[in-house]
């Protein structure tokens, strides 16, 4: 037995040609790893570029179907859908999120009916639906956790019933993953996958997304710091991850 040291160990042996390098590569990125966001706008036809996301557009549902076909033809097999609803449907509790056959649910059904092979990820959060732009129910200036979870659970069930393959709670309420998983199991959505935003930071990087779903104006100068994480805390992110049970 010899020790792993030069000259018995020559790591350059593994780099002598491109095929060998490919054979032992640790990280490979392909179109199978990509997820294309689709922003679908209610009562809208055509496309509308999102100024803070160059090259990304708000789409009417018919245009979204065309976009999904183009995405599949390009070799990307997964999409994440986000709703842009009419402002007059927004209220303080995001009630439109749990209405049967709401806009995003009907859009998901249309996409899955036409493209059953696409992996469709649906966002679970209330900020596209609330008139204050927060991800939960407000009591005064405070987002209340447990009452928000009740709505998120119903929203998740609605999206699963519409045909979403994966449910992605992005709200950062404590305990929502366990509650949603339990409800999905109870309602026989056992194969629906949960993709949790387990560690979501209160970051300016979310600004373009809020522009995309038209929630930025509703949020105004209000902060999401009471539920999204402080950007300075990495250990807290690990703690959040340890609390996820799905």
Feature locations, PLM:
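Conserved small/polar residues in nucleotide/adenosyl-binding loops
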Residues: 245-246
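Conserved anion-binding
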Residues: 127-135, 173-230
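Hydrophobic faces of well-ordered beta-strands that scaffold small-molecule active sites
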Residues: 34-37, 79-81, 120-122, 167-169, ...
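N-terminal amphipathic alpha-helix/helix-capping segment at the start of soluble metabolic enzymes
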Residues: 2-39, 44-46, 216, 224
